[in-house]
Each structure stands twice: as C-alpha cells, then as structure tokens.
Amino acid sequence: IHDVWIEDGIAYSSNWKHGVYMIDVGNGVAGGSPSNPVAMSNYSYESGAHHATFPFKSKSTDKFYTVLGDEIFPQGIDVYTTNETAGFIHFVDFTDINNPEEVARYELPGHGSHNYWIENDILYVAMYTGGVRIVDISGELMGDLFRQGREIGHINTANPNGYIPNAAMTWGAQLYKGYVF
C-alpha cells in the first residue's frame, strides 16, 4: 500500500502492481466499517506503478472516476540529476464499480507524475521535472488529454541557477484559497 484516500467512508487504496482498491470503511454501502472493512471493487493496469488515487465526480457529466497516478523511475536514476521520470495519470470510469474502465490519460512526454489535486473539474498535477501542470478535465474524458490540448497552464519549477541546475523534482500540487502550493 502506498497512499490511501478516504472520502465519504470509502477508502481508495493505491497498491502499486495490484492497482487501486475501493474499500467500504464506514460508508455502509457494502456493509463495511472501520473495524470491519469490506472490499467493493478494484482496478489494475499493466505498468504496475500505481502510486496515488484521487476519487473524482465530474461536475459537468456526473460521472465518477478514480484518477490514478503512476510513479516510475528509470533503473539507476540519480535524484541529483535531471534524469527523466515516466508515468502518467489514468482516468478510470468507476460509475459502474463492477466494471471500471480506463477512458483517458494525461501524459506529459519525458516527465512522470507524482501527487495531484482536483477541484472544480481542474487537475493540478506535479510532474517531477515537468513542474506543475493545470489540466481542464471537464466534459467527456476520452483518449490522451495532453494531445487534446486540455492543459490550460503550467508552472516551470526548474531553475538553471538551482543547487542542482534544472533538477526540480516537483512532488506536489495542492490548491488552497486560489493558490497552488
């Protein structure tokens, strides 16, 4: 288990190669409680690099997604260089929890994803050496969101005068009172 997100009594557990698990830990919809958790659904994908999960109900379509993030470092990566990371954000439609389906992704070539935040149908994602990316995820989600031009802004966190020039390794992006931290 890596990250766990709990919303409305349902835990979304990120389990690397085993994917994401939805577990009733107090919602009661599957008879679960904190002392008696009950697995509801799961979804895994080929890369086996499932690092983070964020439940997301689209305001514009009313569909329910889990947004899954990869974390992939090339063999032998040195975190004190500008080596490229890999991995992307998967959008899995969990509207029918018995038949989850990956419908879209956000992949920034040469930069892997880490942590992210969603608010008002906008994704704020830390892309390690790619800085922070801001992506419109309103409407129907299908295919490659980067190639569709859904990125609406970015913050370049690389600094040529940094301790390690241009080795930003951005880990998180969280919105708070209109600011991204």
Question: What is each PLM-predicted segment?
Answer:
Residues 1-181:
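Feature marking well-ordered beta-strand scaffolds used for ligand recognition
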